[in-house]
């Protein structure tokens, strides 16, 4: 039997304690708990995209009731459509000449990235300006010089002229129609001819007299020209000028007339037979959408009845049913491609075929028209 003394017991206890301490010291030292990760900072809001700045240049006042008014109505329509994505401005009554270059250059220099120059006479100024502003897109109405950062666009106004002619041919009592012409360029000559062709489709005895004012917007001259035509036997007047002066004159003289570019009914409600209008909104909407989506390209666009860019509206109550039916027939044909206004045989004043029987004039031919068709009196100014 083994006996342990008190001293021995104390010694064993001490050794035991040291061993325990040593074992504890050999264990892994406990690390402090990591600090919680800071919450992620809120993402900074993306900077607001600046609106596309768009400028319009008009040849007449926006209150002309016709051409410039139609463009400005389309400007307002795209403002409503695109909201804060765009910012528009306009300058009215810009003369076609040296001053036009200054005005359009200022538009480009002032941060506008899309510029609409809405008259034929702005073509050369735009050609001079465009190379200096490669990041600006220029759209020139009724012109033909496109490329680079310049596109051109037009409306087939001759289709509206033809539709008006249908009514005139059905309703004239004198068989003499009158046209107040603005500037003798192919666009206007084409409209005079198409008006006459439309009238002759209803009444082959029609003749058309023309008086030129050599300006787009010149109410006093337009009034004088309209009066001259009425005195010359015309009982229905048509115009390719920008103010309602022709319609007003017809109202005062007890004759009939058409509105042009915009609905002009209010300017001569008794004289008004209908208005051949241009709707620029579809094209302007397309261009803005293309620019916003980096899809814009330089090209020439020529829209008409098919694209809802041309129509005749607000027909007078006394327009006969046969004329209304003919108008609807022609519009349907223009939309589905089964009808062409300039399909031969079409003859000039001398009786020469300018479009052969069964042939359809192409757009290049249409853009270069500088002659009158059979039934139009006088000569095209400047034509050989």
Model-derived segments and spans:
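Secretory targeting signals
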Residues: 1-4, 15-19
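N-terminal export leaders
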Residues: 6-10
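Short hydrophobic/aromatic segments of transmembrane alpha-helices and their interfaces
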Residues: 11, 16, 323-324
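N-terminal helix-turn-helix DNA-binding module of bacterial transcription factors
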Residues: 11-12, 27-29
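C-terminal motif of bacterial Sec signal peptides marking the signal peptidase cleavage site
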Residues: 22-25
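A residue-level marker of the well-folded mature domains of exported/periplasmic proteins
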Residues: 29-384
């Amino acid at each position: 039997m083994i006996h342990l003394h008190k001293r021995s017991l104390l010694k064993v206890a001490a050794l035991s304690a040291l061993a325990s301490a040593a074992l504890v010291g050999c264990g892994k030292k406990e690390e402090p708990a990591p600090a919680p990760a800071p919450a992620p900072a809120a993402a900074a809001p993306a900077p607001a995209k600046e609106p596309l700045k768009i400028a319009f240049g008009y040849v007449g006042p926006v209150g002309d009731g016709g051409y410039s008014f139609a463009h400005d109505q389309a400007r307002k329509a795209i403002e409503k459509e695109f909201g804060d994505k765009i910012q528009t401005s306009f300058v009215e009554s810009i003369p076609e000449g040296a001053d036009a270059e200054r005005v359009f250059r200022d538009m480009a220099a002032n941060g506008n990235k899309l510029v609409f120059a809405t008259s034929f006479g702005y073509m050369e100024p735009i050609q001079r300006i465009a190379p200096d502003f490669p990041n600006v897109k220029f759209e020139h109405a009724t012109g033909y010089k496109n490329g680079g950062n310049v596109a051109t666009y037009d409306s087939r106004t001759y289709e509206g002229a033809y539709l008006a002619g249908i009514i005139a041919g059905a309703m004239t009592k004198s068989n003499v129609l009158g046209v107040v012409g603005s500037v003798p360029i192919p666009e206007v000559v084409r409209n005079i001819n198409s008006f006459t062709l439309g009238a002759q489709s209803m009444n082959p005895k029609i003749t058309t007299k023309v008086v030129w004012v050599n300006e787009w917007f010149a109410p006093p001259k337009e009034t004088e020209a309209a009066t001259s035509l009425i005195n010359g036997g015309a009982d229905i007047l048509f115009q390719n000028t920008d103010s309602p002066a022709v319609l007003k004159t017809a109202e005062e003289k007890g004759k009939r007339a058409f509105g042009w570019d915009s609905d002009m009914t209010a300017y001569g409600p008794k004289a008004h037979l209908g208005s051949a209008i241009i709707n620029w909104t579809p094209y302007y909407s397309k261009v803005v959408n293309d620019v916003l989506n980096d899809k814009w390209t330089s090209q020439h666009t020529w829209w008409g009845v098919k694209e809802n860019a041309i129509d005749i509206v607000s027909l007078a109550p006394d327009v006969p049913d046969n004329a209304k039916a003919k108008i609807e027939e022609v519009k349907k044909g223009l939309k589905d491609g089964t009808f062409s206004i300039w399909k031969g045989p079409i003859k000039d004043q001398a009786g020469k075929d300018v479009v052969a029987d069964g042939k359809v004039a192409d757009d290049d031919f249409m853009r270069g028209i500088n002659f009158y068709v059979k039934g139009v009196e006088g000569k095209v100014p400047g034509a050989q």
